[in-house]
């Protein structure tokens, strides 16, 4: 399967929402107006790049990359990687690898000293995948949900 990785654009919004519904099936679907406003805020946020994987004209995966300025590590930024998702029918075909390799390239281009991602502790297959790409479990993560 041939996959093209590219920055997402507004026209990808329906496909992105479909991917996110696979990632978090219990989340309510956002209303179209709010989704569009949110996308436009994401699109204009400094340091933010949402990448999509496209195959045969279909968006089959995505990753959300945010490069954050940093006053430590010689002022080198770091990249926060979020919302890594590939359509179920396209998993284990190299799409996720291509997305994270593109994120890695972007991190290097922006001088990041690290890429950081969190994954629910129950997602063992995802953990094995991330480790196959060089990610290591070296810290304990915490979340505080606000609602």
Show the residue positions of the predicted features.
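A short helix-loop-beta-strand connector motif used in the catalytic cores of GNAT acetyltransferases and
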Residues: 40-52, 80
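Conserved beta-strand in the GNAT
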Residues: 52, 58-67, 85
